[in-house]
Amino acid sequence: MEVFEAIESGCVSDVIKALKGNDSDPNMVNEYGCSLLHCAVENGNTEIARILLLEGANPDLYTESTPTALHRAVILRHYDIVNLLMEFNVDPDNYENHESRTPLEYAVKLNDVKMTKTLLDYGADAEDIYRFNCPINDAAANGNLEICKLLIDAGARINSRSMGSVYTIHHAIRSGNYELVVELLSRGALPDVEDELSFSSLHHAVMEGSADMVLTLLEHGASVDVQDFCGRTPLFLAANASELDIVKVLLDFWADTSVSSGRNTPLSVCDLNSDTGIEIAKQIISTMVINTEYKYHKVINEEARRNDLEIIESNNEMKDWKDSCIEEVEKMRKTTLGSDRRSLLDLCLNCDDNAIAKCLNCISCEGFFIYRQLIEYTIERGLLRHESLDKALDVMEKAFEKNRNVKDNGLKDWSDLPLGIKYDILEKIDEEDLPYC
C-alpha cells in the first residue's frame, strides 16, 4: 500500500512515483473501505486529488462504510476539492450508502452557506422527491434564512412536509427566527397548514412564545380559532401558558373565548394566583363583554360561555371587572358623534372606515380606560382613510385641472363638482383602487 502511505505523507512526487512504479489501480481501497481519492480528500490535498482524478480515479466511488469523495469534502469543508470534483463531473446528488443523504443535505445540516451555494451552482437538486426529509426543512429548523433563500431560488418547495407532517413554516417558527418566518410567508408559505397532531402554524407560534410571529401569521390570514387534536385553540394555549402579549394579539383579531377543550376554556385555565394570569382573565372578560355588541360575532360554544359567566360571578374581582366593562360599553353607546349622531360604540365595531373618517375630529379616548386601545385603533383607521381620500382628491384635481386658455363649452367635469360630492364618489372606491400617483 505504498500509494496510501505516499498520500498520507502529502508528497506529490512520491504519489506520482507510487502510482507509476507499481502500475497501481487508482480505484483501489484499503482495509477500511477508503479509496485513494478518499484519503486525498481526508487530508485536504487538492493537488493529489487532481492527480488521482487524472489517473482515472472514480469521483463517485463509495463503499458500504465510506460515502463518496464529495460527501467527505462537503463534511470537511474542503471547498477547493468540491470545485475540483465538480470539474470532473461528479454526481452532486449521489446518495451515500449508509446514511442516504446527499452532499447538499450535509451542507445544509452544517449551516454552510458557501458550500450550499457551491453545490446549487453546480446543479445539486434542491427538491428531490425521494428524500425522507427536505433540505429546506433542515435549513428552516436551523433558522438559517440565507440557506432557505438559496434553496427556494433553486426550486425547493416552500410548503414541504417532513416526518409528522411538519411543514417548512413550522420548522421556521420552532427555530425562533422571526425574519425567516416573514420571508417564508412573503414567498407563499401557507399560514394555516397543520401537522399530524392538528397543530397549526399559529399553535406553534404560541408555543414558541412569540407575539410577533402570532401577529404576522394572523396578518397573512391564519385562522385565529383553529383547534388542535384536543380541541385547544391558540388562545387556550396562550392563556394556559400565561402569555399575556400573545393573548392580547389574539383577542385583537377577535379570537373566540368560548372554544373549549373538554370543559376547560381560556378563562378557566388562567392562573389567578399570578398578576399575569389575572390580567389575562381581565382581557378575556373585556372581550366577552364587547363581543356581544359586534354584529358579525358569533359565539361558537354557548354552553362554554355560560360556564365562563358562572366563573366570573363566583369571583368578586372578575365580577367587578365585568361590571366595569359593561359600564364603559354603555358610556361608548351613549357617546354620539358627527352629523349622523353615530354612537362611539357603533363606530368602533360596526362602521366602515368612511364613516369613521367623517367623525374623526369628534372621536376621543378621553374618559375611557378599558376600551381605550379599541378607540385608538378606530381613530387610526379613520386617519388612514382620511389621508387616502385627501391624496386621491389631490390627484383627481390635478388630472382634471381646466386649461384657462380653452373656451368653456358648457360641459361639466370633475372640477365643477361640489367638494362633498367628490368625497362621496371617492368613498365608494376601495383603498387599493384609489387614484394614487
Curated annotation (Swiss-Prot):
Keywords: ANK repeat, Repeat. SMART domains: ANK. SUPFAM superfamilies: Ankyrin repeat. ANK repeats lie at residues 32-61, 65-94, 99-128, 131-160, 164-195, 197-226, 230-259. Transmembrane segments: none annotated. This is Putative ankyrin repeat protein FPV014. PROSITE patterns: ANK_REP_REGION, ANK_REPEAT. The keyword Repeat applies. InterPro entries: Ankyrin_rpt, Ankyrin_rpt-contain_sf, PRANC_domain. The keyword Repeat applies. It comes from Fowlpox virus (strain NVSL) (FPV).
